[in-house]
């Protein structure tokens, strides 16, 4: 379950902060990476093999979140308060508490529901130590080109490796837009991984520190 969350959560971030045109950019980037790595077919086969119970899990789920802030200049080193607000927005959306929950388009009313997923910043790190759930890594990269440096923020020397994706939802916050010079901007991306599949080391969500975080306007 935890491994399917990054891709689903990306829809929340994108819905909150960007236009439909930008959503297409993120989808194109994600699909291209999966095709280049030969993962698209693997994902389809793996999902086909999942029992129905895993796709429609009942009950509730609490997901520990590890937020990795990878920054070059101080403006990119987003404060704890912004991250806490981001987690609150995620919980509103996934518990049906967002203000416009009742205004969903008629096309989707039949599929609307509350998945009973709660997100919280991790309190224990992979080594068993107490943590705030937030890591901060200063990088020499002025920004990460989403076309050429898609996953550079997820490992040294440019960034930081994910915490165990079977136990945590990893979110990287960094600059993936400032060098694009206008036009279409990729504000975030994620992949749809399945446990044991090649590529699990890049599980998680990447969002832009500026365009991908919209702490002041919660609309979904």
Model-flagged regions — what are they?
Residues 17-18, 77, 102:
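Short linear functional motifs in flexible/disordered or boundary regions
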Residues 18, 48-62, 155-167:
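Short, surface-exposed loop and linker segments with low hydrophobicity and enrichment for Pro/Ser/Thr
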Residues 21-60, 94:
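N-terminal zymogen propeptides
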Residues 5, 41, 81-84:
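Generic alpha-helical secondary structure signal
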Residues 46-91, 173-178, 185, 190, ...:
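Fold-level signature of zinc-dependent metallopeptidase catalytic domains
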Residues 88-220:
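Metzincin-family zinc-dependent endopeptidase catalytic domain
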Residues 1-29, 90:
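Bacterial Sec-dependent N-terminal signal peptides
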């Amino acid at each position: 379950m935890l491994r399917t969350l990054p891709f689903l959560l990306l829809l929340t971030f994108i819905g909150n902060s960007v236009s439909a045109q930008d959503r297409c950019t993120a989808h194109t980037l994600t699909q291209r990476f999966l095709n280049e790595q030969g993962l698209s077919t693997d994902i389809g086969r793996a999902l086909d093999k999942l029992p129905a119970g895993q796709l429609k899990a009942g009950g509730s789920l609490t997901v520990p979140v590890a937020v990795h802030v990878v920054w070059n200049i101080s403006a990119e080193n987003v404060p704890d308060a912004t991250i806490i607000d981001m987690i609150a927005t995620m919980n509103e959306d996934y518990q049906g508490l967002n203000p416009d929950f009742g205004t969903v388009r008629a096309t989707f009313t039949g599929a609307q529901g509350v998945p009973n997923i709660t997100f919280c910043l991790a309190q224990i790190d992979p080594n068993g130590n107490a943590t705030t759930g937030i890591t901060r890594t200063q990088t020499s990269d002025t920004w990460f080109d989403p076309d050429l440096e898609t996953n550079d923020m997820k490992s040294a020397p440019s960034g930081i490796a994910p915490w165990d994706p079977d136990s945590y939802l990893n979110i990287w916050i960094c600059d993936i837009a400032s060098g694009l010079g206008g036009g279409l901007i990729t504000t975030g991306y994620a992949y749809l991984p399945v446990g044991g599949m090649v590529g699990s080391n890049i599980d998680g969500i990447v969002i832009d520190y500026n365009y991908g975080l919209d702490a002041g306007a919660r609309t979904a």
